A protein has these predicted regions:
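Short, surface-exposed patches at the edges or C-terminal ends of soluble domains, predominantly
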Residues: 1-197
Length: 197
């Protein structure tokens, strides 16, 4: 793997140790070759993270094949998959920092090989989330109905693109007719304005 420059900077700047618990049902004989190959790539990428980190990165691998281990994996947010024979198997991770036990563990419920282009991003996002006590705030200004609202007596959801942002940021709707920003302004403004209007 050749890591992105941003990833390298983030890893070099780590100030606290990171523990990555990798749950992989590698002993299950029914796992297909594509999953096994992808597992090798995930482990290789985690090894690169470990090698380049400015603080210790511990990788602990477990193979949850007993019912109790599988139940514990599900309780920690991992998403079970089912083989053609009806057996559960897992391939995900829980990321924590021993120095920051009060912080919410970050879970990657399932490593899907179809999402490989986003693998590095998913790991970086999970590690970065450990250090934030509060998500950064983004103000959203738009005359379009981009945020959750009620129309025709129905609740209309937030636009999909903004829902994706909400996984890492707190979005604050700002009235486009307001003459000034709120007293506690967000650190970033997102102005959504269609070009043709």
């Amino acid at each position: 793997y050749t890591l992105d420059a941003h990833t390298r900077r983030m890893l070099a700047g780590l100030r606290h140790p990171v523990r990555i618990e990798l749950f992989y049902s590698g002993s299950n004989p029914e796992l297909d070759g594509q999953t096994r190959k992808y597992a090798g790539r995930v482990k290789q990428l985690l090894g690169e993270f470990q090698r380049l980190a400015g603080a210790p990165v511990t990788i602990v691998q477990s193979d949850p094949h007993s019912a109790s281990a599988q139940g514990a994996a599900e309780e920690r947010g991992l998403k079970a998959q089912i083989t053609s024979m009806g057996e559960l198997w897992f391939f995900g991770a829980v990321i924590t920092s021993p120095d920051l036990p009060e912080r919410q563990p970050q879970t990657i419920p399932f490593f899907d090989y179809r999402e490989e282009p986003r693998l590095e991003y998913s790991l970086v996002r999970a590690i970065n989330a450990l250090w934030r006590s509060h998500p950064p705030r983004i103000g959203v200004i738009s005359t379009l109905p981009v945020m959750e609202h009620i129309a025709d007596r129905q609740l209309k959801p937030t636009w999909w693109a903004l829902q994706q942002l909400m996984t890492d940021f707190e979005l604050v709707g700002i009235d486009p007719t307001a003459g000034k920003l709120p007293d506690n302004p967000p650190g970033l403004l997102l102005i959504i304005h269609p070009n043709a209007i």
